[in-house]
Curated annotation (Swiss-Prot):
Protein modification: The N-terminus is blocked.
Annotated positions of the Phosphoserine modification: 378
Record's catalysed reaction(s): 3-(carbamoylamino)propanoate + H2O + 2 H(+) = beta-alanine + NH4(+) + CO2; 3-(carbamoylamino)-2-methylpropanoate + H2O + 2 H(+) = (R)-3-amino-2-methylpropanoate + NH4(+) + CO2
Pathway(s) the chain acts in: Amino-acid biosynthesis; beta-alanine biosynthesis
Sequence similarity: Belongs to the carbon-nitrogen hydrolase superfamily. BUP family.
Protein name stated in the entry: Beta-ureidopropionase
Subunit relationships: Homodimer, homotetramer, homooctamer; can also form higher homooligomers.
Species assigned in the record: Rattus norvegicus (Rat)
Annotated GO MF terms: beta-ureidopropionase activity; protein homodimerization activity; zinc ion binding
Functional note: Catalyzes a late step in pyrimidine degradation. Converts N-carbamoyl-beta-alanine (3-ureidopropanoate) into beta-alanine, ammonia and carbon dioxide. Likewise, converts N-carbamoyl-beta-aminoisobutyrate (3-ureidoisobutyrate) into beta-aminoisobutyrate, ammonia and carbon dioxide.
One Pfam family, short name: CN_hydrolase
Gene giving rise to this polypeptide: Upb1
Domain CN hydrolase: 72-344
EC number in record: 3.5.1.6
């Protein structure tokens, strides 16, 4: 596995390939070339001063006679935790709020309409430890917790929709915990929330020690800037998860994540891009950055020696379009903001071209899946009938 000093696949290709070869490789890896956005000088200067990467790209669409372009700019934020995990909880939360506020201000300079933060952005991703304290103290109300109120102010100040993935404390239902994304309108009002539908039980991802599978289904939020959904982290491995957000009308599906190189880096460039193709929508994959060390060693029953960290979070956030094209990714080792301009007309244009929704045969799969989940289901396997086989004599 590449270490944190390896910046990105894009940098490696650009460094070692001749221009003609590079063009062909990018055509295959990234599809139709995206246009570079001309970002404001003051935004670029602010990003440099605040020590984070700022990149901007745009997807086009064919001009139509009956519809105006539906242009929306999304901002994906990837970042490391600014304080050690041993710092007091309140100080860690405050430091993360400050860091995100710095980045959100630059997003506003770039005209971002919808901004999404990484999974459990206001805390370390400490679920590997299986310890309850102090990590459960980061949990907050999705409706009126400290972090939600912070994001409401950001949303109203900058006139942008905010997607805020947090560890939720649901006090209306016994104080149980959920892995939740809060969606806040550009008016500053909480539109609602969605929960992580699939919980990993692999390696050090011991998340089911804290929370279980979400119970809110696949909600899609009708914002001023388009219909959006949030497929949290591990849910990207489940094609039906993406599908149901699309069935409910999502034009943009965000995938805020916290995943490490050893586990998933080779899968990362494929899954969200494939989902964009299969579901005729835009997908936005974002991942945290860096390595987080915990005071106490932990193990996960996988034969590895006790250790103090989960692994290296490799960033590499990107956006994919329904035509299969995608932006270059942000770096593997820097905080960053990826600004991407989308024309939502492309969703219908590609739907009309490839017709996956028309040819998807959902009724057939619904019928067969309804049978497959029954306890007495017998798989439809056709075997050779040896009784009817011709004799060798």
């Amino acid at each position: 596995m590449a270490g944190p000093e390896w910046q990105s696949l894009e940098q490696c290709l650009e460094k070692h390939l001749p221009p003609d070869d590079l063009s062909q490789v990018k055509r295959i890896l990234y599809g139709k070339q995206t246009r570079n956005l001309d970002l404001p000088r003051k935004a670029l200067e602010a990003a440099s001063e605040r020590n984070f990467e700022l990149k901007g790209y745009a997807f086009g669409a064919a001009k139509e006679q009956q519809r105006c372009p539906q242009i929306v700019r999304v901002g994906l934020v990837q970042n490391r935790i600014p304080l050690p995990t041993s710092a007091p909880v309140a100080e860690q939360v405050s430091a993360l709020h400050k860091r995100i506020e710095e980045i959100a201000e630059v997003a506003a300079m770039c005209g971002v309409n919808i901004i999404c933060f990484q999974e459990a952005w206001n805390m370390p991703f400490a679920f590997c430890t299986r310890e309850k304290l102090p990590w459960t103290e980061f949990a907050e109300s999705a409706e009126d917790g400290l972090t939600t109120r912070f994001c409401q102010k950001l949303a109203k100040k900058h006139n942008m929709v905010v997607i805020s993935p947090i560890l939720e404390r649901d006090r209306d239902h016994g104080g149980v915990l959920w892995n939740t994304a809060v969606v806040i309108s550009n008016s500053g009002l909480v539109m609602g929330k969605t929960r992580k539908n699939h919980i990993p039980r692999v390696g050090d991802f011991n998340e089911s020690t804290y929370y279980m599978e979400g119970n809110l289904g696949h909600p899609v939020f009708q914002t001023q800037f388009g219909r959006i959904a949030v497929n949290i982290c591990y849910g990207r491995h489940h094609p039906l998860n993406w599908l149901m957000y699309s069935v409910n009308g999502a034009e943009i599906i965000f995938n805020p994540s916290a995943t490490i190189g050893e586990l998933s880096e080779s899968m990362w460039p494929i899954e969200a891009r494939n989902a964009a193709i299969a579901n005729h929508c835009f997908t936005c994959a974002l991942n945290r950055v860096g390595q987080e060390h915990y005071p106490n060693e932990f193990t996960s029953g996988d034969g590895k020696k006790a250790h103090h960290d989960l692994g290296y979070f490799y960033g590499s956030s990107y956006v994919a379009a329904p035509d299969g094209s995608r932006t270059p990714g942000l770096s593997r080792n820097q905080d960053g903001l990826l600004v991407t301009e989308l024309n939502l007309n492309l969703c219908q244009q590609i739907n009309d071209f490839w017709t996956f929704k028309m040819t998807g045969r959902l009724e057939m799969y619904a019928r067969e899946l309804a049978e497959a989940v029954k306890p007495n289901y017998s798989p439809n396997i056709v075997k050779e009938d040896l009784v009817l086989a011709p004799s060798s004599g």
